[in-house]
Amino acid sequence: MIARAVIGVLGLLAAIVLAACGGDGAGGEPFDLTLDFYVNPDHAGIYTALDRGYFADAGLDLNPQVPSDPSAPIKQVAAGRADLAISYEPEVVLARDQGLDVVAVAALVNGPLTSLISLPEADIASASDLAGKTVVTAGIPYQAAYLDTILGRAGVDPETVDQVDVGFNLMPPVISGRADAMFGGFLNVEGVDLAERGLDPRVVPVDELGVPTYDELVLVADADRVAEDPEPIREFLVALERGTDAAARDPQAATDALVEAGDGLDPELTRAEVDATLPRLVPPGDMPYGWMDPERWQRFADYLYEAGQIESTADAADLLTNDLLPRAREQSG
């Protein structure tokens, strides 16, 4: 997953067991969903739909699985070991570049969550203030490209910034003062956590710092599966839209569903994270639920190519399809 606070091995194993126990159990068609990481507020629509039986209504026995390796979801789908996976737009572009025949079928979070996060005492009012600072990162190559873009736009020599890879454990160095900022934390997770601690974080998503905007989280399927057996995926998306609508109407119920499914989630913090997340789970304007903008995807894929993150140019038409979205079906039928 992209830059989240790390959890221990035992906690992750427990989360795997708990998430795996989330199936509707109504005798529907088995449907395996590989999550991006442990249960978190980005999954509010999923677990609300699961709690209310919407997947069962759609004829699906949903089995959400927490991956043992956060890089595994797309590989699970490509290998036929999952029906859908939650991943990230840049990961889809990278996977296609590496020859994996996968396609994004819906946006789960249609805007960047990845952010530059600092505390007031670091005195970072803008990216130009990063010169001479220590920034902890998750060590993800394309996020390093983001940071290079941001520094270049701000006129900062990357050599003047001490970038330290700490994996997903981004918060402790910032809280302790050993680092001036974190890059890669999510505005609705680390940003909210720091705010709930009363630390008044400055949180700036990457698209406000010069990185082309993109869909942070997407649902990914095997391209052959989409062509040959799309109906279960369509029904999943119908149920997920219902769950997301229900979560937006009743954030406390969404919080309760997440806390019940997750391992050791703090109810108050989870509610704050859910409140920060829900507005980002619905598309802008009148776009269908899950809509992905092909032109925006093309710009982002071109950016990754120009940044040296992929070897060949990518065509957005190969990266995504909006054909399985609920209202896309209504409009075509």
Region roles according to the model:
Residues 17-20:
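C-terminal motif of bacterial Sec signal peptides marking the signal peptidase cleavage site
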Residues 297-333:
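Conserved C-terminal helix/tail region of periplasmic/extracytoplasmic solute-binding proteins
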Residues 27-167, 171-188, 203-205:
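Short, glycine-/small- and polar/acidic-enriched structural segments
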Residues 1-10:
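Bacterial N-terminal signal peptides that target proteins for export
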Residues 227-307:
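Secondary-structure end/capping motifs
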Residues 90, 169-173, 178-264:
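Pocket-lining segment of extracytoplasmic ligand-binding domains
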Residues 22-24:
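Bacterial signal peptide processing site
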Residues 158-162, 263-275, 311-318:
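Short, surface-exposed acidic
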